[in-house]
């Protein structure tokens, strides 16, 4: 028979004590002799059997023991130290040996049993046998050979920090010999309530998984299983819908599959569960949907609780971190002990720690000195302030009282302009659009751009704005009355006008002469031969190719005047310089719009005299038509910088700037468009131009827009009137 199923496994000797206050003598054990003798003790008559312990009484804590629950407790008859009781008043007929067996774990030596007092009582033998989960009360009897020991030793085991202490139950007034602490590798958890006090044969109740899941407290276990299974489903079956309800369905399914085939892997179990789920009706699924809803509520509540605990912990950690570390208490120094203030502080530290955060700053005030600003920093600050005071008003924003009185209006407007964040963001958005930038470049004042991009240390933007605004408010006649300094330095004679041509003021050609007078020093006399004129025209074409893109497409616009067919020369100027590409000229003051305004009245007079109105000019579809017709006739390769719209043929892709700037009328915008057509018309090569002799009054300066338009047409339509040509073009389209 296996000894581990019969006795407790103890690594050290056992001392057993039972109560018998009426006994006069004790039986002692002498471990030194092989067969020791003991003092005889009369055996008392049997005492009345006590009432068994009721189930509502608190039982003593028990631990798991290595005793089989189905077998009675039988003392082994192995050789050991016998306990002999000799006859007394009751006079037993024979001495019955009682062996106390000491057992230990394998591999450890057996230690001798020390002297122990044993008292026998007339109570039934009771032994509490714990199980794996619950503990039941077992009733066992001794063999028939030991009839005189018809009592049961009520022993209890009290766990104290991982040790066992064997003591008597119920307690006695005699001195009790306790067991030496013994460490056990088995579970010492306290069993659940309701597992004690049951009478009858030895019965051990174990909580199987079925019983655990059938109890109300198994909801928590199912909730944890549901969370784990839901994670597995999301990992292995991501395409599954209703993961929560399907996970609830898998709880019993996976349990059944695990019982039938424990070696089945998780993926196979999930696939089989999915097949069963697909075969389940919607009515049968309702219970799992309800369960999943409850579990989802539990999970959300748990997450909220966890977040709340994290917040509380973080707050506690911050509070602990902000509290200054307390210095360890020190013995008061003799010189400090005489001061009453320091003594009171010491007492407060020892009695009430809550006042420590309030007294801590007082110490700092006494020990630390206030921080002083270094003189170097003060000096540097003063230098920076002096340097800022030397900036003009536009940078620092600070103005003197006189300037504030004089320029109160413009300053307030500028401040509002720079302080409006929405306006600045809108301007940035517009500047990011290419079409808008091209439109602005067509009307922006080049003088303003030149001043902004210049390297001058001080720029008075307000004064420049005033000058430009004043210039724009002037009429064409007032602008034409302004003197040109180039005319004063160098004499420019105006040729007699053609009698058949309309009269144009002499100052109309002033801008062109003013710009070209500083570059060319050689004049050309009127009436040159046709050969000389043609050679010079060819030289002009060659020089047009050498003109840089900055001169052609820079911020300096051009002004080309249209002419009549009957009068090829509208403006006769004795000084004719080399045209700067497409008949353009350099222009420093004013803007393109301003220059177009100056010749507005003259162009309108020409249109009236030629019976051409601005509405007739707008009959053309777009600038793309002119670009396409002119560039097909160009024999030489035009640089890409010359015209950025070379590859464009759609009218919508080419910007048509017509801004409304301070009361600009639509007529003036149309004039600016006609001016732009004249610019593109100047690209007609010289080979296609008719070589008119001096008798026809050919001007060797820039060609007019009407001349360019006629030159671009075939020679057979050379002498057709303009109105007829336009009507034919309309019929063609």
Swiss-Prot record:
Residues 187-207, 489-535, 691-733 are annotated as: Disordered. The gene is Nutm2. InterPro entries: NUT (IPR024310), NUT_N (IPR024309). Pfam families: NUT (PF12881). Residues 715-733 have a biased composition (Basic residues). It comes from Mus musculus (Mouse). Belongs to the NUT family. This is NUT family member 2.
